[in-house]
Amino acid sequence: MIKILRNINNNIVNRYDGLNKSYLNINFYCSTTNNSSGKIDYTKLIPENGNISKSITEKIGKNLHCKRDHPLNIIKKKIQYHFQNKLSDEEHKFQFFDSFEPKVSVKENFDELLFPVDHVGRSPNDTYYFSKDQLLRTHTSAHQSQLLREQEKAFLVTGDVYRRDTIDAVHYPVFHQMEGVKVFKDKVNLAIDGKPFDETIDYYEDNNYKQLQSVKDVEKDLKQSLESMIRSVIGQDLQVRWIDAYFPFTSPSFEMEIYFQGQWLEVLGCGVVHPSIMNNCGLSNDRAWAFGIGLERLAMILFNIPDIRLFWTEDNRFHNQFKGVDKSISTSSSSSSSSSSSSSSTLSDIDIKGVQFQQFSKYPSCFKDVSFWLEDEENFHENKFYEFVRESCGDLVERVDLVDNFTNKKLNKTSHCYRIYYRSMDRNLTNEEIDILQFNLREKLENHLSVKLR
């Protein structure tokens, strides 16, 4: 398997080099940056009617991870198979949840996961809000506390998640994650170190807590489980290393990196569930681990898929390449609520050896520039511009780059110049089509953002 993967075009791997953490940490936010002038109340920045655009609304309910023969479904089943057949035991039989609704509360998505009130992830520049109280989940961890309260001991949650982001071959405002959690009852920790939950302890910084035998045991089980899982998907000879990290809802926290195509790539975030979360879920004497992994990322690496937009295409030239890879008998593997799961269905492993995407689109890209002055620089955010471009031009935009940024001291104004690359995945775009798209974008730009065209 590893030998086959080594033949993958290095350009696929290089696309990930230097990407921002909002994508690399596919399930766990990393930023702890606070506004230097004090804490930001992001609820005051949320538009009264939300900030969810039509193009995002149209993606809700597509559930690509549940569509048989879709590469995301194949990756999901590969991981589920390993947890069901290799990592389940009498006490921990992993349950699968694939159909939780993406509309969740701010409490579920942020508060219960200990996100600080001024965490950048709460910003409407990063998150899609229906209102100040409800949003489109930014990670499948939004369902963690609910399932813990319902006494689920071992589970995987897969779903679509939503984040406002840049435009390029590996970023898309909708992508898919898998969250995994395993709970260890009190006999694993209290009997060992006799340390119940203590609200006075800073569990992020307290080294005595991190050195408890129960915490070390859970950490060991976490790393062993995830190493066996990733090797079952990518290859048994895979090199893996662990990097210390920070996430609001785990402590200690880690990132897994794999050595692939000559460089180390971060593939998932994980850690021991924060004791405060366990306490709030009525499990103060228990410990648990959790991880989050992005399905698109694995699929792009494994199947040599060069552009994240392809996962959303309806072109049969894409889908026919994965048809029949899953040879298992078709059974429903999704649950619409936490009261049911797919654990009763026995999964079969899927052989993905030699499955490589063959590009059918060789159409060249064409770029157009747009320059403007920022009329309200303090409230301008690049994600607002990217969102506007997506809404105006759809998936015909391959990527957008900021190519010039300067301040005119006499005018006391800042100018941005963005280069917009147009490219269809399934046909050749004419110059006339591109000119119309660019003209319409310029026509609407000043009315939608506080800018002045140059």
Swiss-Prot record:
Residues 361-454 form the FDX-ACB domain. It is an enzyme of class 6 (ligase). It holds the Pfam family FDX-ACB. Coiled coil: none annotated. Residues 327-347 are annotated as: Disordered. InterPro entries: aa-tRNA-synth_II, aa-tRNA-synth_II/BPL/LPL, Fdx_antiC-bd, Fdx_antiC-bd_sf, Phenylalanyl-tRNA_Synthase. One of its GO terms (molecular function) is phenylalanine-tRNA ligase activity. Substrate binds at S141, A142, H143, Q144, R163, V170, H171, Y172, Q177, M178, E179, E266, F291. It catalyses: tRNA(Phe) + L-phenylalanine + ATP = L-phenylalanyl-tRNA(Phe) + AMP + diphosphate + H(+). The keyword Transit peptide applies. It is found in: Mitochondrion matrix. Residues 328-347 have a biased composition (Low complexity). Its EC number is 6.1.1.20. Keywords: Aminoacyl-tRNA synthetase, ATP-binding, Ligase, Mitochondrion, Nucleotide-binding, Protein biosynthesis, Transit peptide. The keyword Protein biosynthesis applies. One of its GO terms (biological process) is tRNA processing. Monomer. Is responsible for the charging of tRNA(Phe) with phenylalanine in mitochondrial translation. Belongs to the class-II aminoacyl-tRNA synthetase family. This is Phenylalanine--tRNA ligase, mitochondrial. The lineage of its organism: Eukaryota, Amoebozoa, Evosea, Eumycetozoa, Dictyostelia.
